[in-house]
């Protein structure tokens, strides 16, 4: 075992790529939860985005068209979820779980003929001047457009929620939908839009997995990424900046354990594979304990149905 074999610049660049699907899916879920809706169907939306994006990417020969298809597929599934919980007034938790099971099954059926096929590639984009900086350039400025989009989206969501009137309205609905309704805000319509955005982002995250991260279709390839995205929203305290940090920590642990396996570290492979998930559980436990002594960051109406 020789730790010097691990290239730090490549390690950081790899963790950014590994974290991107989580950033996208978790960012969408953060907006959904800020509106007062708990969507446990993120995993299902991600896997549908992954298979739809892969199929369209392979058939058209364009990974970018595949990414658009992934976003549309995730948004379409999220509209079904929105209709069930907002119009039919079904339980949010049960509906989200059912949607995840449905998504996993449908994706397995759709993707079966495409197993083992390689997807079209998304090329990396080197930012002029910045990419030439030694070490730092390789780590941060030689990535594909989806990575850059995820970073812009983090800032965009923060700005929307904290600086734009529409974002403040969405937050007010999440805190107390009855008061927001009494002030004339259209609770159902705004939640529909938030859920659709969340589904599209989850779909893009799934598409990134099958078109860039792997890149091929494998049944169940999300491997719990949707659940990790849900955990990251809680970890972040419903703040986009901390969400990005949490995703990069998880991605870093994931890539580090793969590198440790590659250099033959004397630790059981099963333990190394569990490390990212154990770290997530530990972080959630620590956050729960700390919040016993402070203010909870969750929206006041999170998970509660709105009845006119």
What is the predicted function of each stretch?
Residues 1-24, 38, 52, 60-65:
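Membrane-interfacial amphipathic/re-entrant helices at transmembrane-helix boundaries
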Residues 61-106, 249, 254:
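Alpha-helical transmembrane segments within multi-pass membrane transporters and channels
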Residues 18, 25, 50-54, 104-108, ...:
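Hydrophobic core segments of alpha-helical transmembrane domains in multi-pass membrane transport
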Residues 103-163, 263-272, 299-308:
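Transmembrane helix-bundle core of multi-pass membrane transporters
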Residues 139-217, 240-245:
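Helix-loop-helix "hairpin" substructures at the membrane interface of multi-pass membrane proteins
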Residues 12-15, 44, 64-72, 94-97, ...:
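Hydrophobic alpha-helical transmembrane segments
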């Amino acid at each position: 075992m020789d730790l010097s074999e691990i290239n730090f610049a490549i390690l950081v660049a790899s963790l950014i790529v590994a974290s991107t699907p989580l950033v996208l899916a978790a960012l969408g879920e953060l907006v959904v939860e800020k509106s007062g809706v708990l969507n446990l169907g993120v995993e299902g939306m991600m896997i549908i985005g992954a298979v739809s994006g892969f199929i369209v990417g392979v058939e058209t020969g364009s990974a970018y068209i595949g990414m658009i298809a992934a976003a549309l597929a995730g948004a379409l599934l999220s509209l079904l979820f929105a209709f069930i919980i907002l119009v039919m007034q079904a339980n949010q938790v049960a509906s989200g779980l059912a949607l995840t099971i449905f998504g996993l099954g449908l994706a397995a059926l759709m993707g079966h003929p495409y197993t083992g096929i390689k997807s079209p590639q998304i090329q990396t984009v080197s930012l002029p001047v910045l990419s030439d900086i030694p070490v730092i350039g390789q780590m941060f400025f030689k990535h594909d457009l989806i990575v850059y989009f995820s970073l812009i989206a983090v800032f965009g969501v923060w700005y929307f929620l904290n600086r734009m009137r529409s974002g403040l309205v969405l937050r007010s609905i999440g805190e107390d939908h009855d008061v927001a309704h009494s002030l004339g805000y259209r609770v159902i319509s705004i939640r529909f839009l938030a859920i659709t955005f969340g589904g599209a982002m989850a779909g893009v995250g799934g598409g990134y997995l099958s078109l860039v991260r792997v890149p091929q279709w494998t049944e169940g390839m999300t491997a719990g990424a949707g659940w990790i995205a849900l955990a990251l929203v809680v970890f972040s305290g419903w703040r986009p900046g901390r969400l990005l940090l949490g995703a990069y920590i998880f991605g870093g642990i994931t890539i580090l354990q793969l590198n440790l396996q590659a250099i033959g570290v004397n630790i059981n492979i099963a333990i190394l594979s569990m490390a990212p998930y154990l770290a997530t559980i530990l972080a959630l436990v620590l956050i729960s304990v700390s919040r016993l002594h402070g203010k909870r960051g969750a929206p006041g109406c999170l998970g509660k149905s709105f009845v006119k």
